[in-house]
Amino acid sequence: MDDKITIDRIKEAHPRLRDKMLQDYRGANSRLGNGVRLRFAYVFRSNSLQDKLYNQKPKVTNAKGGQSIHNYGLAFDIVLLYDNDNNGTFEEASYSQIKDFDKDTIADWKEVTDYFKSQGWECGADWKKFIDPPHFQYDYGFDWKTLKARVDKGIIITENGITYPKI
């Protein structure tokens, strides 16, 4: 079952990536058992929100506004939701990488991560400098500097009130 908050956040993803992101969200979510649901905690982030996160303590990002793939709608961060009392409310949000709520002997986080990686998503868990397990991105081979330069030069599309680089 889809998480409405996640579906709304996917609508803010880069238009070129939106359909893939939705399809892969549903594919990953379908691998989770009853009582577990995948949520995207972030998809698109404005530069001002990015700066706020950058200045937060403890440190949660190395990227200032404009320096994150999130700022271009090409990334998402995940969190797993658990319905501990089986009433459909999913009262626990978790970043646990070991919990196996559906008792299939594979950690729920691993099931989701393995699926996204199999679909071509880069995972922040594999980074060497700033390891970021909840982060996934599909950047079409562009780094943030190139994406920012496109926006700065007006090579853009605007949709839903959000400006994205043309890619």
Where are these regions (language model features)?
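Cell-envelope/glycan interface and biosynthesis
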Residues: M1-D143, L147, N160-G161, K166
